[in-house]
From Swiss-Prot:
The keyword Transmembrane applies. Residues 144-230 form the PKD domain. Residues 1-25 form the signal peptide. It is a single-pass type I membrane protein. Keywords: Glycoprotein, Golgi apparatus, Membrane, Signal, Transmembrane, Transmembrane helix. Glycans are attached at residues 29, 85, 194. InterPro entries: Ig-like_fold (IPR013783), PKAT (IPR045219), PKAT_KLD (IPR046846), PKD_dom (IPR000601), PKD_dom_sf (IPR035986). PROSITE patterns: PKD (PS50093). Its main location: Golgi. It is found in: Golgi apparatus membrane. The gene is Tmem130. This is Transmembrane protein 130.
Length: 419
């Protein structure tokens, strides 16, 4: 009877614990953090903290001893574990490279059938090589990521990721490749370099770590770990100025072409405007253009004479520049309306000529109708061909005399004298 009573009491206690656990299930989160990735043989610290889902409106359990954290971390080797204030921390070491899942959940103490209050997982990468990264700094602040200024010193450093101080007794060597053909071997993780030309460069560093380790047979041996790291650098030139090539005197309705040369690295955000005076541009007066080269051509036609000023503003990721260009526009002696006068004159002349030719053709036809052709033929025949149709030369001469009354006689008359 006593045993039956004990069993009932035990199950009743479990149900009391199970009730709150079921009610609380789904109301909490487990925040899981780790200082990985890590190198094979180094120690990794993983922490799990119980948190409320609704940002603190629900209180955490008052008695932290009523709950337990359960971990699954195989095949990683557990080196230490501790729990405090609903936070559990473990230390593990990986013997082989790979990505290993870590799982943790929280349940009520002494109740394995209770539903977990919260659970969480993460993937821990273990690498054969060293773990770290390259840090590049310069005494400038640019808005473009990984962008730096040419002809200024760059500080490049390698930061080893070793939170457990596993490599504190190791010796390191660094082989730097700056991407422009320059190589440097040093035992210092920090170097300084100056790029003289703009462009995109990939800086690489090979890190070698060596240390002595006692083998199982009590002999010392040298252990070596290596790692290859790289970083992309975008070197840009500051915008030092704008060169404007173009005329300063112009006539109206004449096409103006200006060439702008930018002394700086593209891309460039260019803004230009036209004013009577050389004053800074407002945003509403700006004609924005994105220039991807170091030159830009601008064309414009002035319709009114006067004094004008072109205002140019350009900026890249490093700096800004302004430039002005004054120009005088004179009235043109060859205005566009002058084209209409010669065209109208030419058309008028053509019309007059056509009318003249038409009238002349009509008059000629009228003369031909009024003058019979037989008269002319008769005259021609009488004058030119008379000798062929007349019977004697005397008749021919008579006809000629009739037609040409002023012709002298062909023979003198014989004078007779009487004595």
């Amino acid at each position: 009877m006593a045993k039956a009573t004990d069993v009932l009491v035990f199950w009743f206690a479990c149900l009391l614990l199970l009730g709150p656990a079921r009610v609380a299930a789904g109301l909490y989160n487990l925040s899981l953090t780790a200082d990985g990735p890590a190198t094979v043989g180094t120690e990794v610290t993983i922490s799990a903290s119980l948190e409320v889902k609704d940002n603190g409106s629900l209180p955490l359990p008052a008695d932290t001893h009523l709950y337990r954290f359960h971990w699954i971390h195989t095949p990683l080797t557990l080196t230490a574990k501790n729990e405090k204030n609903l936070t559990s921390t473990i230390h593990v070491v990986g013997g082989v490279p790979g990505d290993f899942p870590i799982s943790v959940w929280v349940t009520a103490v002494d109740c394995w059938v209770c539903q977990p209050l919260a659970r969480s997982t993460l993937l821990l990468p273990i690498k054969e090589s060293l773990v770290g990264n390259i840090v590049v700094t310069q005494n400038t602040s640019l808005s473009w990521p990984n962008s730096y200024i040419t002809k200024r010193s760059l500080r490049l450093s390698f930061l080893l990721h070793d939170p457990s101080d596993f490599f504190k007794s190791a010796s390191f060597f660094y082989r730097w490749d700056f991407g422009d053909g320059t190589l440097l071997i040093t035992d210092n993780p920090v170097v300084y370099y100056n790029y003289s030309s703009p462009g995109t460069f990939t800086v690489k560093v090979r890190v070698v770590a060596e240390w002595e380790q006692i083998k199982p047979d009590t002999t010392k041996g040298t252990i070596q770990k290596t790692g290859d790291f790289s970083a992309s650098l975008d070197l840009r030139e500051s915008l030092q100025g704008i060169q404007i090539l173009g005329p300063t005197l112009l006539q109206t309705f004449q096409k103006l072409t200006m060439n702008l040369n930018f002394f700086g690295s593209p891309p460039l955000h260019v803004c230009w405007g036209l004013k009577p005076q050389c004053l800074p541009l407002e945003d509403r007066e700006c004609h924005a253009v994105l220039v991807t080269r170091t030159s830009f051509n601008l064309t414009h036609v002035f319709q009114d004479p006067g004094d004008y000023c072109f205002i140019f503003r350009a900026e890249n990721a490093i700096s800004k520049a302004h430039q002005y260009h004054r120009i005088q526009v004179w009235p043109s002696s060859f205005q566009p309306f002058v084209f209409a006068f010669p065209c109208a004159t030419l058309i008028t002349v053509l019309l007059v000529f056509l009318m003249y030719m038409t009238v002349r053709s009509a008059a000629t036809q009228k003369d031909i109708v009024e003058s019979p052709g037989a008269t002319g033929l008769k005259c021609c025949c009488q004058v030119c061909c008379g000798s062929l149709f007349l019977d004697s030369p005397s008749e021919y001469l008579e006809i000629v005399r009739e037609n040409h009354g002023l012709l002298p006689p062909l023979y003198k008359p014989v004078k007779t004298y009487n004595v």
